[in-house]
Amino acid sequence: MQQSLNLKMPSPEFYGNTGGWLRSSDIEEKYAITWSSKNEDIFEIPTGGVAKMKAGDNLLYLAKKEQCLALGNQLKIKFKILNFKIYRIFPNGEAQFLHPKDGVFPEKVNEGRKPIGKIDHNIGKNLNPAEVKFTHKTIF
């Protein structure tokens, strides 16, 4: 699957509802998750209800990024689908690619990824917070 979003992708067949989560998407942003499946399977929607995914490419709109991440986790664990992508869609129709940002999931090691907040010692070498309190030193 490519990084750009194809809005003509088929959506899963719903056997429930989204709980009214997408009503505000006309004035606010919404999120889309896309994935490819080898066969049709029934899955649980994070907003409640179930849907039947199509064989091939699928596109599902959700109101929150967390809902897309929850569905992605379900696709990864239950159906062994690793090629899902998450996009933010603005009211003007512009789509922004969100996840996985550099092509590798955050829990995997990527040689090009720079660590954030990495400290080059183990936890036993940390300073005692009581000794540096009110000294304007940082303990991390």
From Swiss-Prot:
Q: Keywords for this entry?
A: Chloroplast, Membrane, Photosynthesis, Photosystem I, Plastid, Thylakoid
Q: Which GO terms describe its biological process?
A: photosynthesis
Name of the encoding gene: psaD
Q: How does it sit in the membrane?
A: Peripheral membrane protein
PANTHER family xref list: PHOTOSYSTEM I REACTION CENTER SUBUNIT II, CHLOROPLASTIC, PHOTOSYSTEM I REACTION CENTER SUBUNIT II-1, CHLOROPLASTIC-RELATED
Q: What is this protein called?
A: Photosystem I reaction center subunit II
Do the record's keywords include Membrane? yes
Where found? Plastid, Chloroplast thylakoid membrane
